[in-house]
Amino acid sequence: MKKYIYPYMAFLLLLAGCSGDFLDKEPTDSVSSDEVGVPGNAERLFNGAWYNLFEYGTTYANIGYRALQCQDDMMADDVVSRPAYGFNSSYQFNDIAIPNNSRTSFAWYLIYKTIDNCNTAIAIDGDSEEFFQAKGQALALRAFCYLHLAQHYQFTYLKDPTAPCVPIYTEPTTSETVPKAKSTVAQVYQRVFDDLNLAQSYLKNYTRKGDGQKFKPNTNVVNGLLARAYLLTGQWEEAAKAAVAARQGYSLMTTTAEYEGFNNVSNK
C-alpha cells in the first residue's frame, strides 16, 4: 500500500509547488501600491480606470456608466416613465438634485473615482512612446468625465460661463486631500480642451492593435470629444473641423452593417 501512497504524495507536492505558476497571472488593469509610479504600468492604470467606469456598481440598477446613460434617457424624455422600467427618480431630476439619493452618490463617486484613477496614470513620469500614448488615453478619459460633469451639474456654457460648476482635480487624492471648491463652467471646459489637445499630440502615432483595444481612445475619439466640446461652447466652425477629423478613415455604413455593429466587435 505504501508504494502507492508515496508517489501520490510526491505528485501532490509537485502540483502544489507549480500551481502558482499557472494561477498567478499578471493583471492588466491594476497595479500594487508599490508599482504605481512605474512608467510601464501607465497602461494598466488606464485600463483599470476604464473598467471602473463601466463595471463599478452599488445596486442592480446602478452598474457603471451605462446606468448614467439610462438616467439621461429618462431626464431627456427619450423614454416614457413607467414603474416597470424604473429610473423614475431620474425623470423627476432627483438623481442629480437630492444628495442622499442612491444614484446621486453613485454617479458622483463613479465619475470622480475614474478621474482620480486617470490622475494617477497622468502623474507618472516616463519617456517612452508607449508611456505617452497611455498618458494620452488617460487624458482623453479624464476630459470625457469632466465633459459629463459640466453637462449634468450646471446650465450650458452659452447661458453663463462664469456660473459655479464642479470641482477640478488634476492630481491623485488621498484621505488627507482637502476638498476643492467649485470651478466655473468656463474653467471646467478649459480643462477639457487642455486635456484633449494634449491627448491628441500624445496619440498622433497610436494605432489600436486589434478588436480587443477598441475601447482605447485614439485621435478619432479625441476629435469626436473635441467636436462635442466645441458645440457645447458655441464654437461652430471648430466643431465642424473636429467632426470631419473624427470621421477620417471611416465611411457611412449600410443599414445591414449598422445592425451588425451591435453584435460583432469586428464591425467598423
Model regions: which residues?
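Inward-facing hydrophobic residues that define packing positions of alpha-helical scaffold repeats
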Residues: 115-118, 189, 196, 243
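Sec-dependent bacterial lipoprotein signal peptides
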Residues: 1-16
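Conserved, well-structured interaction surfaces
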Residues: 83-153, 183, 201-204
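Short coil/linker segments at helix-helix boundaries
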Residues: 152-186, 190
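Structural signature of alpha-solenoid helical repeat junctions
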Residues: 130-134, 141, 188, 211-214, ...
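Membrane-proximal, proline-rich intrinsically disordered regions
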Residues: 18-68
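Hydrophobic-face positions in mid-chain alpha helices that act as interaction patches
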Residues: 44, 57-60, 64, 75, ...
